[in-house]
């Protein structure tokens, strides 16, 4: 399957390395998410003044909005070391126990995709989060006994794209729960200009805004599009990313003015032309366009809902009049 240039997931190790090189180090350098930043600034300063670990933090929202970056920034602001892992990587209770017992006082433990932890793993986390202790069972059968190990004060930062899949007991143990929202065009323009400076790429304000406009409210996509448009500027232009060049390059990359690609358009066309605009169930849509249900839920639907192209109802998904207009299809409202 071909790489989607507007996918909000990281594509490969090279892109992970690229993102790491762009990451801000402080909250003041972090662009966007102002409400989240303002609250975290207070919480971090208060914890520092009390010489305590920051409360456990849950960050949730669509992929590519900066959850991992924000976790790194929090650790940096606290002057703490950060250890990173992910839900799928913690397969056995012993895996988590090894990580927890390696923590030093004040460390930050970042668990990406925390919703994918098994219930058995979650149960080990409960006392670790609440009481900074770890209950382990030694032996088996009638001779088995439980031993409690003390852990140093630490901060757990969990990140998820699907907060609804977290169990209530785990969710309730986070003292700080923040939702990361899609970025505005102005914020993404600022991000594109910042990234172009790091990449030593010449770009004008209108060129940056054109890239931002097609970036689906997502910094990861904005940075990826900038890299590709930069290639066109060097090969087919004079090295400077202008509005005209950005439009031409993104059109060739099949990213339309609202940030939709051929897969998004296929989804909308299917709802409109095969199912009379809906409502139609997500499983039916997935089967019709050859995509996984989870891919549509995580990668396509949030943005299409955000820009008003889709509506989610108890009976299924509906394509809106705005979607019809964008695709140039006549909209006839049923009476």
Curated annotation (Swiss-Prot):
Q: What is known of its domains?
A: Has 3 domains, the large (RuvB-L) and small ATPase (RuvB-S) domains and the C-terminal head (RuvB-H) domain. The head domain binds DNA, while the ATPase domains jointly bind ATP, ADP or are empty depending on the state of the subunit in the translocation cycle. During a single DNA translocation step the structure of each domain remains the same, but their relative positions change.
Which intervals of the chain are annotated as region Head domain (RuvB-H)? 257-335
Name recorded for this polypeptide: Holliday junction branch migration complex subunit RuvB
Top-level class of the enzyme under EC nomenclature: hydrolase
Disulfide links within the chain: none
Give the taxonomic lineage as stored in the record. Bacteria, Bacillati, Bacillota, Bacilli, Bacillales
Query: Its GO biological process terms?
Result: DNA recombination; DNA repair
Gene for this protein? ruvB
Q: Which organism is it from?
A: Listeria innocua serovar 6a (strain ATCC BAA-680 / CLIP 11262)
Fetch the PANTHER family from UniProt: HOLLIDAY JUNCTION BRANCH MIGRATION COMPLEX SUBUNIT RUVB, PTHR42848
InterPro entries, A to Z: AAA+_ATPase, AAA_lid_4, DNA_helicase_Holl-junc_RuvB, P-loop_NTPase, RuvB-like_N, RuvB_C, WH-like_DNA-bd_sf, WH_DNA-bd_sf
Question: For this protein, what is any one GO molecular function term?
Answer: ATP hydrolysis activity
Q: How does it assemble?
A: Homohexamer. Forms an RuvA(8)-RuvB(12)-Holliday junction (HJ) complex. HJ DNA is sandwiched between 2 RuvA tetramers; dsDNA enters through RuvA and exits via RuvB. An RuvB hexamer assembles on each DNA strand where it exits the tetramer. Each RuvB hexamer is contacted by two RuvA subunits (via domain III) on 2 adjacent RuvB subunits; this complex drives branch migration. In the full resolvosome a probable DNA-RuvA(4)-RuvB(12)-RuvC(2) complex forms which resolves the HJ.
Q: What does this protein do?
A: The RuvA-RuvB-RuvC complex processes Holliday junction (HJ) DNA during genetic recombination and DNA repair, while the RuvA-RuvB complex plays an important role in the rescue of blocked DNA replication forks via replication fork reversal (RFR). RuvA specifically binds to HJ cruciform DNA, conferring on it an open structure. The RuvB hexamer acts as an ATP-dependent pump, pulling dsDNA into and through the RuvAB complex. RuvB forms 2 homohexamers on either side of HJ DNA bound by 1 or 2 RuvA tetramers; 4 subunits per hexamer contact DNA at a time.
